[in-house]
Amino acid sequence: MQKQYFILLLIASFALAQTSADQFYREDQIYSSVGYPLLIDVPEALAQNKLSHTFSLGFVRDMPINVARNLAFGLGLGLNYNVVYTNLQFTDHMEAYTFVSSDMTNQWNYMEVEIPFEFRWRSSAPSNYQFWRVYGGLVGYYNLFAKQRTRTALIDSIASLSVQKFRLALRLNIGNNTWNLTYTHPIDSFFDFDKSTHNKLFSQLKIAKLGLVFYIF
C-alpha cells in the first residue's frame, strides 16, 4: 500500500510540475530559414541569374510580456550564408567592373552573424502547437566574409568584396504552423565603396531576402 501511495505521489508531483512549466511556456526559439536574395536599387543592366539562395540558422530568446504569453519580445543570434548569382563582376580591387557573358558564372558568396530583435504575436496556448504567428522587427548583420567567384571553362578565380561590416534591416515573419513566410528589407547598402573604390554606380545596391522560415522548437 505504501508503494502505491508513493507512486501516486510521484505522478501528482510530475503533473504539478508539468502544469507549472506549461504556465511559463516559450515558443519558437530555434529557427531555420531558406530563401532567395533580391538585388534592389540597381542599374537596369545588372541582372540576377541561376538560382541564388540564402540559408540561416539561429536561436531567439522568447520573452513573453503578458499573462497569456502570446505577446513577446525576442532577441536572438544566428548565422546566415548567401550565394548571389549575378552578371556584375568587379575587377581591379573593385575599382572597375564588367557585365559578364552568359557562358560565365559569377557569384557573390558571403556569411554573416545576424542579431534579430522582434515583437511577437501568436495565437498559441500551452497545449496548442498549431497557431498563427506574426513576428516583426529589426535584424542587425555583422559580415564575416564576402567573396566573388568567377568561373568559365578555363578559369576559376576568387576575389574579396568590400562590403559594409555592419548593416540593419527590417524583418517580418508571418504564417501558421510549419509554413511561415519571411521577408527582410535592407536599410543599409551592401557595398562599402568609400574605402575601396571611386566607383559609385552601385553604392546604393541593397539585398533583400524572401523565403520560408521554420521554427524547430
Name every feature range the model reports, one short phrase each.
Residues 57-63, 77-79, 113-121, 136-140, ...:
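Residues on the lipid-exposed face of transmembrane beta-strands in outer-membrane beta-barrel proteins
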